[in-house]
Amino acid sequence: FTMSITLNGQLLLCLLAEGLMHIEGLRLIQVNTDGLTVRVPRQNKWLVDLARAGWQSRTGLNLEEAIYKTMMIRDVNNYIAQYEDGNVKRKGAYEYDMDWHQNAGGLVIAKVAEKVLTEDAPIRETLHNWPDIMDFMLRTKVPRSSHLAIERDGVTSQLQNITRYYIAEGGGRLFKWMPPLAKNPGQWRKIGVESGWGVHPCNDIKDAGKLPVDFDYYIREVEKLCLGLA
């Protein structure tokens, strides 16, 4: 039953999208499982309303409407949109108001990306002046069968299985040590975390700032969310 309702709803959205594509100047931005987004000249907005009303009458379903001032989209599941009243909608990689069960690592990346996209803020300067070191924190974890270790200056130190860290200049290399696979029963697997970057463990917040933040990493991550968007 659930599958039939889901498929039927998606097919009906496709029907709506097909009808909207006949409107002059309209551009279909995205179609998701529960809605769609279009860009249309203001003078043709009434045609969208007409198509919407006809679709609702035909299907017996109701459509909610939201009008954006601007929308920056990486893909259908990752985008940021600003309403006409200034409020912001965030999805996927652009979210930073996390629930307790979600990974709240690297919040500075999404927060700075939003400022870049909605306020035209400079990436490097905004990151360098960011006031909260906690927003730079990342985290990784491994199951009990594995362990985390950091290598620095020829010394290897084991870390707790859930470890908080930030990308730091002069930091060590972080690795996951995973149990052997059946085809190589005697060989533990060494998997890099943030390969190519130094990290500084920070399970105790007093350790924050002992090594300088490597801003180049965070600049690169912000650029991934800001450059080349539709």
Can you name each region flagged by the protein language model?
Residues 15-24, 50-58:
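Generic non-transmembrane alpha-helical segments
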